[in-house]
Amino acid sequence: MEASLSNHILNFSVDLYKRLKPSGKDTAGNVFCSPFSIAAALSMALAGARGNTAKQIAAILHSNDDKIHDHFSSFLCKLPSYAPDVALHIANRMYSEQTFHPKAEYTTLLQKSYDSTIKAVDFAGNADRVRLEVNAWVEEVTRSKIRDLLAPGTVDSSTSLILVNAIYFKGLWDSQFKPSATKPGDFHLTPQTSKKVDMMHQKGDFKMGHCSDLKVTALEIPYKGNKTSMVILLPEDVEGLSVLEEHLTAPKLSALLGGMYVTSDVNLRLPKFKLEQSIGLKDVLMAMGVKDFFTSLADLSGISAAGNLCASDIIHKAFVEVNEEGTEAAAATAIPIMLMCARFPQVVNFFVDRPFMFLIHSHDPDVVLFMGSIREL
């Protein structure tokens, strides 16, 4: 069951990331999102979707049955005692217009599988007050890291319901970086240009892996408790991130993550960074195949028999900060591979001094919670 959730989220993560990354001549800009958060919101919508609408949402979640709700339920039930050494909080809520009556089966499923609270509100009479209430709840759940999720105008008197997922993560490194070892260092933006940034440093044993097909080396930095970790995907050269993004697939990423082994005496240099991104996902999800959900063709009859429901957009906002102590992050959705068999040299330098990808994931089950890339600091 849990392995299935791992597969759903991993496949969705890679598909989504490839849509969010810079494309064409636009090679600038950072990316950060929570695939888990977006997938959870979509899965809650899937529970009320029928016909082609359900098929389209299920397809991008790589799910072909209703068991995805059980998979989410199993994972969410673990959270209270899952990783006592880190803060990992996930909350779901449905805001429903007080004159709109969703089906009892739907609200029961949300409560059972997603531990979702259901709140009746007055969209018709005071939509902006509801918007502020949603924002206040998200801000509380994410420890004030996600503010103003819904901008003015995103909610109006015609809104019937809002499905919200919020996720908050704060983990201390299992082996923290010493602030005294942080020094200015070059981060290469292009082969010709670089920027001085605060570069953290430590030497230790880390799991590493290499994929010659993707021309990337991976290094895992565990958080306390070893139930969660950050993985850095470092391309071989300054312009290698675009190559990695173009050729990345879920099976390749899975093989890379599963093929890492402990490497001793690694000199690790990692820049401190902070990111915040707000994304309207309507166009992205429509391009991925979820077309009916945002139009009059939407079939959400599992939510209400009255019909005439469709989504206006899916708003996602994510935040991450990485420093010497650890990481704070928040958000309000088989191919053969050549792994390097030879051991790494006796002393390995892993200098994150060029554009790179990263992800934060849980273990047992292995679920991608956050994913992103840094091109600019």
Curated annotation (Swiss-Prot):
Any GO MF annotation of the entry = serine-type endopeptidase inhibitor activity
Give me the Gene Ontology terms describing cellular component: extracellular space
Instruction: Indicate the principal place this protein occupies in or around the cell.
Output: secreted
Question: Do you know which SUPFAM superfamilies this protein is assigned to?
Answer: Serpins
Description of what induces expression:
Induced by blood feeding.
Reported impact of L339A: Abolishes ability to inhibit host serine proteases, host intrinsic pathways of blood coagulation and fibrinolysis. Does not affect the inhibition of TNF-alpha release from PBMCs
Tissues expressed in: Female saliva (at protein level). Female salivary gland (at protein level).
The entry's localization annotation reads:
Secreted
Which residues have a glycan attached per UniProt? N11, N226
| Result for mutant: A332P | Abolishes ability to inhibit host serine proteases
The similarity annotation says: Belongs to the serpin family.
Q: Anything else the record notes?
A: Inhibition of LPS-induced TNF-alpha release is independent of the antiprotease activity of iris.
Per the entry, what this protein does is: Serine protease inhibitor with anticoagulant and immunosuppressive properties that can modulate blood feeding of ticks on vertebrate species. Strongly inhibits human leukocyte elastase (ELANE) and porcine pancreatic elastase. Moderately inhibits human tPA/tissue-type plasminogen activator (PLAT), coagulation factor Xa (F10), thrombin (F2) and trypsin. Does not inhibit human plasmin (PLG). Inhibits platelet aggregation. Inhibits the intrinsic pathway of blood coagulation in the host. Inhibits fibrinolysis in the host. Inhibits proliferation of mouse splenocytes.
The protein's name: Iris
State the organism of origin: Ixodes ricinus (Common tick)
